[in-house]
Amino acid sequence: DDLKLEATKVSYHLRESGEKVAVIGGFNSESLFTPVEEMGQKTTLLDRQSLLQACGRGYFIVGILGPGQEPTNHALHDIAALKSDLEKWNRKMVLLFPDEEQYKKFQPTEFPGLPSTIIYGIDTDGNIQKQITESMKLSSSAALPVFIIADTFNRVVFVSQGYTIGLGEQLMKVIHGL
């Protein structure tokens, strides 16, 4: 009964669509959120507006964050590392918090170098997160962060949920394919 363990190398190839970018789902760009002005001590909630109003026509990124959670922190550092690329793209990135309490926990000073194209806000009533979770058939709405790249024709071309290595690079790969 002398069993010997032997390592076997297996080649792995991730198949990719031949198209540059594929539409993988839908998302309503008229969804409302509450934009927030000023990070830190003084918080001003602005009037609710749609993502379309905030971002203008074209593509945009939406992220639902879990402040203080490692997967969110990791994602924000990845995004900060690609600040100049994201700013050159010149499209809005809307980073949303589940509620005002979560927003107040966020410390932007922990993430120096985030792109200037970011709009912070609150996912009023959790509608945006719920819509993304349902339309993209994600496993659980609790696993944050969630990021999508979508356009104002309600097409989603990228989704990521939870802990993701190289999120910034993944976003840029899709952006360059648009």
Task: Describe the predicted segments one by one.
Residues 117-127:
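Short acidic-hydrophobic, aromatic-tinged amphipathic segments that line or gate anion-handling sites
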Residues 50-54, 131-138:
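Short amphipathic alpha-helix with an adjacent loop that forms part of the alpha/beta core around
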Residues 55-60, 87-93, 115-117, 144, ...:
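Loop/turn elements at helix/coil->beta-strand transitions in domains of secreted/extracellular proteins
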Residues 115-119, 134-148:
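Structural micro-motif
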Residues 21-60, 68, 77-81:
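A short beta-strand-turn-helix
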Residues 60, 64-114, 127-133:
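Structural microenvironment flanking redox-active thiols in thiol-disulfide oxidoreductases
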Residues 1-40, 71, 84-87, 127:
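Oxidative protein folding and maturation machinery
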Residues 3-22, 142-178:
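Thiol-/selenol-based redox modules, centered on thioredoxin-like
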